[in-house]
């Protein structure tokens, strides 16, 4: 019930955002939240790539190892050139927004705010975290947020404690990370956005280019057999063809306005058993003590030999 309610509220927010602020660019990880039980397919692909078709660099940084019941940060970098703009839903130039998804191992969750350090509070200012679902608190989402201010997104994470949860074990785990900047090229419905290239659906000759609704252009193509087919190009992409041009199916009718893209990366983290650390420290201490004893013994022998005139 709570999941259905959260999905309904998410749909309502999306609808209002598109109606009230159509010029805003989007990088909504919760598109995936509403359409997929898990953001990662069996192939390993994060589903955001189904709508954000361009591949871009995403970087992740996590500690090599952490202790049980400790707070650490996972940083996701979504780099792009500052000040870069893209085509908004209404065809105007808008700044890029970013979003990220972090799939933590089972048991790892968003750290409670009362355990955030002052540094974490400063690094996460203006960032709102949500979990993928009530059943998956280990999958965290952020976005959309202004990209120029948040090209690095810091996730405060709480590690689990095997002493209090028998399902958790010490060892090495994988973290799956996805990061996006800018709008997608395809909506979850399968429809194209105005942030993508449009191509000819058939071979033939450009018969006409007429204005359509809301600033769109309707390109009519007359095929060799006399039939006609049209392609509606929304406001935003630049039409590259002219009336009378001969084209083949798949020929680009517009430029590609997209400047954003999605990337994913995996990272590894070790949930370290503190007993092993204590044992390792004890071993190092024993080795150091043995070295000291050997040095002292050697000096003692040298003194005895010197006294005996050897």
From Swiss-Prot:
Cofactor note text: Binds 1 heme group covalently.
PROSITE patterns, sorted: CYTF
Pfam families found in the cross-reference section: Apocytochr_F_C (PF01333), Apocytochr_F_N (PF16639)
Keywords: Electron transport, Heme, Iron, Membrane, Metal-binding, Photosynthesis, Signal, Thylakoid, Transmembrane, Transmembrane helix, Transport
Topology of this chain in the membrane: Single-pass membrane protein
Classification via Gene3D superfamilies: 2.40.50.100, Cytochrome f large domain, Single helix bin
SUPFAM superfamilies to which the protein is assigned, alphabetical: Cytochrome f subunit of the cytochrome b6f complex, transmembrane anchor, Cytochrome f, large domain, Rudiment single hybrid motif
Gene Ontology terms describing biological process: photosynthesis
UniProt xrefs under NCBIfam families: PRK02693.1
UniProt family annotation: Belongs to the cytochrome f family.
Protein name according to UniProt: Cytochrome f
Organism this protein belongs to: Synechococcus sp. (strain CC9605)
């Amino acid at each position: 019930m709570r999941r259905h309610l959260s999905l309904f509220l998410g749909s309502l927010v999306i609808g209002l955002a598109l109606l009230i602020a159509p010029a805003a660019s989007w990088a909504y990880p919760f598109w995936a939240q509403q359409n997929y039980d898990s953001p990662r397919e069996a192939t390993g692909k994060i589903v955001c790539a189904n709508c954000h078709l361009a591949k871009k660099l995403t970087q992740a940084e996590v500690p090599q190892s952490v202790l049980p019941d400790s707070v650490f940060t996972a940083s996701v970098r979504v780099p792009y050139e500052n000040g870069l703009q893209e085509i908004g839903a209404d065809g105007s130039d808008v700044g890029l927004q970013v979003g990220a998804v972090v799939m933590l191992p089972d048991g790892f969750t968003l750290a409670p705010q009362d355990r955030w350090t002052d540094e974490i509070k400063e690094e996460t200012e203006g960032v709102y975290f949500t979990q993928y679902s009530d059943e998956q608190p280990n999958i965290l989402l952020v976005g959309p947020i202004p990209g120029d201010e948040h090209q690095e997104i810091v996730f405060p994470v709480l590690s689990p404690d095997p002493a209090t949860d028998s399902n958790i074990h010490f060892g090495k785990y994988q973290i799956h990370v996805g990061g996006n900047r800018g709008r997608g090229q395809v909506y979850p419905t399968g429809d194209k956005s105005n942030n993508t290239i449009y191509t000819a659906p058939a071979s033939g000759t450009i018969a006409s280019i007429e204005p359509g609704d809301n600033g769109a252009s309707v390109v009519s193509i007359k095929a060799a057999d006399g039939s006609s087919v049209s392609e509606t190009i929304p406001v935003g992409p630049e039409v590259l063809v002219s009336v009378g041009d001969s084209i083949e199916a798949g020929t680009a009718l517009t430029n590609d306005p997209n400047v954003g893209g999605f990337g994913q990366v995996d990272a590894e983290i070790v949930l370290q058993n503190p007993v092993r650390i204590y044992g390792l420290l004890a071993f190092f201490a024993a080795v150091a003590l043995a070295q000291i004893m050997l040095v002292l013994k050697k000096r003692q022998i040298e003194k005895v030999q010197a006294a005996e005139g050897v």
